[in-house]
């Protein structure tokens, strides 16, 4: 049995459509949600269906085909199958529908669209960016729940994943040590892959956009035998694109395949592979400023590299899962994945000598590997006359990196070519012969852990979520951490059938290899996240909303031991370190996602974060921003509305990204990007039951801004001007 939710009108509550300061629009909308829900029919949650938006009684997490901007459940935080309202942490989900509506194709664009996350275009990393949340860099990305290690400063080894193979992206903000082990108290990003289907489905899309951007995508899934116990799926993409920045030209293609086999009615084996190749001509490291940090108002197309710069990357991934479902409702799952990127790049840099800018060129190659394993069992148990949930498991991951390279003979010397940013010719420098043996680095890290988590229903409205992890960490330099305990505690109280309040305490640790005056390694950095909030769930889960306040204390940070020897024993320069530094982050997050009416999808989020030094060896740092290049305020909004009547078959949408000012200052230069907002528009025409034509307009108002700023000579990445993408989707 199903019911249709009536089209309801929004109560005003003084929500006039006029310019409001940052969060006011989101707050106004959040205040309206209970009233919207009250106007809807009192249909049982297990039976509710909004027109075009499915809400399943089975609490399915899959978003493909749902038409929704939210999902039923997420287990990224605890591996317990909890709804967003039942999870005592801030969770956001970027669904397949929102990815398609916004025309998002890369992980960078996805992070830019998710509440609380900051994306800054990277330096020397191909076309990928660095990610942060709550004032700290993100250093954990998960694939189907299995963690992988990021590079320094939250840059994922130059990999900007193509989203065609993913169903959704789940993000848990704050300390996530229960599932990830080590890392920063920022967030964990879980990339959830598409799965095979038992019924046939196939689609094809072709896109053409600004700056000769061409893209083809094919996706097919079906049962492979009559009994439907063997199922498969294949996704293929090909893209060739230029850029608004001169010289830049990228070509990439990927192939993804996955097979599910029911070995028995209660046992399923999944195996898959993913291959992606990226060939980029040109590597942009941004534009320079004046020596004092003033922007030079260069054309947005300015490219200050050479025409022989390039970035070649190949990514190979294999993965497997074995799941067994017991008769008593428990399940056990064993999963493994191995990802092996290979990078070969040549890129240009700029150094400043007084008022003179000089050009340099570098090359390097890198071979990386990340192997992750996880085994866990989960199910329900009875205690004190109530049903509770439990998960227990163990995980292991190993990461290695071998890189080597060199630089042109003239680099950083007086013979280096002089660069005039106003009159630079990318072809004016001949390709140098670079000796790749000038430097080499290699590293191996391993970490293992055992974990457990439970949700205990102490009373009808009250649940307690408890967990803990014991971790072991080591690297090939001899540094190790043994039996590091990471606690997890949260409480959720249901105010009624739609609203809950919660509070949580979560932790994470981060190894640091610096040594003290006694030549002993410092103890790990600890990250503790305190959080409290309120969550709402409406229309049987078709709409989720949350508001949270948080405080993060990152302690034991290595700082200079000014009372110790200089140089530190065993080193040629610099003080020894002591684990006494502290950074404190405080803030507010608001998040709304899902269906407001049968035809109206919305995702809106506001974030305010203040992260500052509380203890440091340099007294001048106390009270200063931990990283002023991260904006304190962010507003993100995406909406889509399906028209009716004479305009039936049309869907229109818009998006807004706004952020506060950012700064970069080292004493000699001061860069500042003021607050800005960019607007996107999209419209889709359902030609017939199989074909849809969609137009996306990004930066519709053609705002001129710097997407990220870094220094006076590199890292100042200009935001893309207005651009369009036209896509034809066809379902076979």
Enumerate the language-model features and the residues they cover.
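C-terminal beta-signal and adjacent terminal beta-strands/loops
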Residues: 4, 657-665, 681-732
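Acidic/polar loop-and-plug regions of large Gram-negative outer-membrane beta-barrel proteins
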Residues: 239-243, 256-325, 336-368, 413-443, ...
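Extracytoplasmic beta-strand/coil segments of soluble accessory domains associated
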Residues: 69-92, 96, 108-147, 167
């Amino acid at each position: 049995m199903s019911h249709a939710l009536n089209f309801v009108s929004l109560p005003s509550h003084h929500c006039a459509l006029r310019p409001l300061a940052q969060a006011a629009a989101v707050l106004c909308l959040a205040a309206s949600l209970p009233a919207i829900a009250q106007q809807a029919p009192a249909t049982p949650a297990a039976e509710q269906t909004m027109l075009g938006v499915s809400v399943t009684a089975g609490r399915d997490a899959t978003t493909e085909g749902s038409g929704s901007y939210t999902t039923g459940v997420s287990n990224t935080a605890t591996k317990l199958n909890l709804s967003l309202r039942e999870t005592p942490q801030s969770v956001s989900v970027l669904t397949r529908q929102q990815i398609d509506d916004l025309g998002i194709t890369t992980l960078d664009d996805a992070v830019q669209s998710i509440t609380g996350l900051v994306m800054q275009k990277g330096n020397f990393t191909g076309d990928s960016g660095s990610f942060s949340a709550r004032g700290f860099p993100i250093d954990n990305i998960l694939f189907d729940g299995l963690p992988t290690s990021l590079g320094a400063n939250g840059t994922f080894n130059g990999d900007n994943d193509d989203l065609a193979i993913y169903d959704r992206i789940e993000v848990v903000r704050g300390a996530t040590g229960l599932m990830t082990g080590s890392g920063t108290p920022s967030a964990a990003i879980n990339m959830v892959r598409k799965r095979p289907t038992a019924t046939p489905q196939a689609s094809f899309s072709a896109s053409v956009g600004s700056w000769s951007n061409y893209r083809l995508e094919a996706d097919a899934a079906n049962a492979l035998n009559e009994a439907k116990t063997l199922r498969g799926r294949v996704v293929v993409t090909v893209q060739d694109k230029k850029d608004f920045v001169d010289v830049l030209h990228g070509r990439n293609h990927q192939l993804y395949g996955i097979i599910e086999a029911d070995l028995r009615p209660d046992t399923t084996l999944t195996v898959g592979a993913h291959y992606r190749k990226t060939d980029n001509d040109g590597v942009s490291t941004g534009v320079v400023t004046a020596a004092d940090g003033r922007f030079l108002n260069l054309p947005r197309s300015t490219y200050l590299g050479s025409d022989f710069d390039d970035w070649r990357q190949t990514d190979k991934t294999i993965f497997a899962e074995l799941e067994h479902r017991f008769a008593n409702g428990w399940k056990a799952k064993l999963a493994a994945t191995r990802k092996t990127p290979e990078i070969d790049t040549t890129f240009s840099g700029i150094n400043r000598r007084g008022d003179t800018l000089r050009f340099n060129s570098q090359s390097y190659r890198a071979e990386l590997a990340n192997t992750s394993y996880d085994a866990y069992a989960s199910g329900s148990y009875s205690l004190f006359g109530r049903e509770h949930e439990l998960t227990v498991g163990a995980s292991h991951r190993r990461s290695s990196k071998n890189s080597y390279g060199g630089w042109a003979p003239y680099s950083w010397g007086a013979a280096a070519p002089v660069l005039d940013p106003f009159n630079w010719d990318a072809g004016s420098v001949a390709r140098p012969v670079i000796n790749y043996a000038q430097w080499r680095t290699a590293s191996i890290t391993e970490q293992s852990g055992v974990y457990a988590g439970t949700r205990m229903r102490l009373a009808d409205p009250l649940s307690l979520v408890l967990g803990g992890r014991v971790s072991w960490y080591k690297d090939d330099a001899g540094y190790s951490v043994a039996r590091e305990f990471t606690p997890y505690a949260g409480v959720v109280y249901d105010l009624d059938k739609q609203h809950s309040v919660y509070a949580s305490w979560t932790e994470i640790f981060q190894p640091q290899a610096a040594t003290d005056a006694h030549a002993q390694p410092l103890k790990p950095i600890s990250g503790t996240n305190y959080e409290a909030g309120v969550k709402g769930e409406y229309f049987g889960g078709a709409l989720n909303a949350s508001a949270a306040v948080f405080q993060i204390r990152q302690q034991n940070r290595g700082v200079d031991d000014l009372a110790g020897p200089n140089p530190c024993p065993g080193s040629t320069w610099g003080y020894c370190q002591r684990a006494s530094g502290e950074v404190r982050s405080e803030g507010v997050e608001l998040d709304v996602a899902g269906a407001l009416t049968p035809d109206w999808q919305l995702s809106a989020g506001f974030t305010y974060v203040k992260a500052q030094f509380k203890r440091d060896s340099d007294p001048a740092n106390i009270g200063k921003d931990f990283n002023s290049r991260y904006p304190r305020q962010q507003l993100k909004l995406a909406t889509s509305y399906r028209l009716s009547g004479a305009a039936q078959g049309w869907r229109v949408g818009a998006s807004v990204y706004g952020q506060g000012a950012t700064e970069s200052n080292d004493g000699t230069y001061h860069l500042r990007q003021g607050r800005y907002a960019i607007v996107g528009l999209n419209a889709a025409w359902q030609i017939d039951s199989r074909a849809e034509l969609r137009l996306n307009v990004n930066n519709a108002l053609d705002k001129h801004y710097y997407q990220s700023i870094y220094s006076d000579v590199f890292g100042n990445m200009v935001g893309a001007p207005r651009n369009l993408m036209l896509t034809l989707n066809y379902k076979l």
